[in-house]
Amino acid sequence: MPLALIEQAVAAAGCQEQRRRLLPAVAVVVFVLGCALFHGEGYGEVARKLAGWLSPLAGPGGWHLPGTGALARARRRAGPAPLRMLFAALAGPLAGGDTPGAWAFGRLLTALDGTTLDVPYSAANIAAFGAPPGAEGRAGGWPQVRLLSLTACGTRGIIDAVFRGCRARCSSEQHLARTIAARGQLIPGMLVLADRNFSGYPVAATLAATGADLLIRVKSSQWLPVLSVLPDGSCRSVLATPRARQRHANARRRGQILAETPAGLPVRLIEADITITPASGTPRTQRCRLITTLLDPATAPAAQVAACYAQRWEIETSYRDLKTFTRGPGQLLRSRHPAGITQEIWALLCICQLTHAARATAARTRALDPDRISYTITLRAIRRALTTSTAGSATSEALSALLPPRRRRSYPRLSLTTTAKRRAARAPLTGTTTCTITITTPAQASDLPGP
């Protein structure tokens, strides 16, 4: 990342100094990025590791190691705006037209999903972010921030991100998704993959209005009228508005069938039985119900669309990259005040994006799928390059330890409390599996007339 990019972010945020300091704003941004890169280290150790990069940026008095108090005050003085501007400059899919795994049906594969980050317990953080409800209605646990991002599946590059306190108003994933849609980051030529949390009409219609195509998993109980059956086994349907859905539900309870097609978003309904056959063990079959705005089965056959949905897991992998490998497993963010938390999250996103950019660059040099480039090896190489001032070695080191082609494996997902996690005997990770997709036509007859 060129230093000029940081200088532009500082200028765009209006953080230029009125006088020269030991730690000017550009140096503070570098230091905050270092805190995200070396998250488990204290301020003093981070400053020592980055001394070779910070000393040329020091003020006219020359460089000496600042105290932790001076570093904390410098962070507060800079605020979150420069890091937000820097992330905006770095954000993007990182995929070219020939990047393996980045495209499907002529569209850029992206995924939309959220996660949470724990922040330190302080009065300021509680006031800004709130705390999750505890037992017997009492507030308990750590305050949390909900982060939602739009990620390119092929490279795990972060296209956009938004976050808010979990207990704040309008902090649900659906509200945050509408915020990303309003920013203009969802555009025609994208195929957005999302889970069942985004299958309601208000959020799906907002996302579709951007011109991007959608592929969303829906609940088995969600009402989707079958208007007609298509040659590939999928069906024409409509994601009804809440008012239309209620009108048809009331009519069905009275034993009536309304003749008109409900108002809403036209979609294709795809129901598929996914059979996973491990090399040793018992096969298991799961029903997957999807809706998509790819309405033409000739250009997007149902079986291929259903197989494409598996790429949504890439955003889960990207959150593992951020929370486990970059921040550290189970770690809190550092700051005890909201502005510092906001600054840290933008810095973490910048570090993740820079690491994914290094992965994408390394993969491009050998026409490899970016999945073959290890995130952890690339991140360690970047850390080592910064501390030894040998910039440029991260790409070659990442290429020297390629991952094998990704295998199909089965690891059933569990949602457990902390106590249950300690007690659960989780099934072992299986070896290579075979996945079979069978498209099924919905058994229920349509309650609507028409072709």
Across the structure, where does each feature detected by a protein language model lie?
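A short, well-structured juxtamembrane/interface segment
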Residues: G92-D98
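Single, function-defining residue in the core of a domain
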Residues: M1-K49, R75-A78, M85-A88, A104-L108, ...
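Short edge-strand/loop segments of extracellular domains
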Residues: W53
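Major-groove recognition helix of helix-turn-helix-like DNA-binding domains
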Residues: G59-A78
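Noncatalytic carbohydrate-binding groove/subsite architecture in carbohydrate-active enzymes
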Residues: G101
